[in-house]
UniProtKB/Swiss-Prot annotation:
PANTHER family: 10 KDA HEAT SHOCK PROTEIN, CO-CHAPERONIN GROES. One of its GO terms (cellular component) is cytoplasm. It comes from Paracoccus denitrificans. This is Co-chaperonin GroES. One of its GO terms (biological process) is chaperone cofactor-dependent protein refolding. Belongs to the GroES chaperonin family. GO terms for molecular function: ATP binding; metal ion binding; protein folding chaperone; protein-folding chaperone binding; unfolded protein binding. It is found in: Cytoplasm.
């Protein structure tokens, strides 16, 4: 199933965190925090100004981004857990 976000929303795939700490300790699944880093998989057409003019999104599919810990809504598309969020929930693009 293809999924295309509407307006200024984006679809994000979380990037999995490391299984070990820098010191070599293995982190169990129950102690892991959900990562606040992901890859944009799909982007809506953008927001509209009051005049109706379209504001193009600043992100594109394939961008790696950081977002707030509680940002977005979890959705399942083709058996994969993704996040859908507003572009304004994105804190920045990782270069």
């Amino acid at each position: 199933m293809a999924f295309k976000p509407l307006h200024d929303r984006v679809l994000v795939r979380r990037v999995q965190s490391d299984e070990k700490t820098k010191g070599g300790l293995i982190i169990p699944d129950s102690a892991k925090e959900k990562p606040a880093e992901g890859e944009i998989t799909s982007v809506g057409e953008g927001a509209r100004k009051d005049s109706g003019e379209l504001i193009a999104p600043a992100v594109k599919a394939g961008d790696r981004v950081l977002f707030g810990k509680w940002s977005g809504t979890e959705v399942t598309v083709d058996g994969e857990e993704l996040l859908i969020m507003k572009e304004s929930d994105i804190l920045g693009i990782i270069a």
